[in-house]
Amino acid sequence: MTVATREIGLQSKGNCDVIDVTSQVEKVVEESRLNSGIVTLFVVGSTAAITTIEYEPRLLSDFRQTWERVIPQNIPYEHNKTWGEENGHSHLRASLLGPSLTVPFVNRKLLLGTWQQIAFVDFDTRPRSRKIIVQILGE
């Protein structure tokens, strides 16, 4: 088995910004020259996450509204008292969704469903430079 580690850099808008990173991950897998294995994506930071979703405008709207219902932005959070930042909800949302995702690949192709894309989600309250660590294990 071979391990290859790469990085994907992003500029996000914050506030539940959802970015389709599927093509970037496909490119990294293709360039790895590994034929079959798994690719693990890890988001650096505690206010962003990664998942799969059908990247469709109305579903993305539903996705954002769901987070506002589950973990509302405009209620008191103890964390907000710590640093004076109003992003307690951002940390909670990111921890619930999670910082990592693993996708298998065969013949250098990700084994995703037809309507399944890899989505980076930034829950923080401001634009940020973000980083996804991509680690490929395969042969």
What kind of region is each of these model predictions?
Residues 1-139:
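Active-site histidine-anchored catalytic micro-motif
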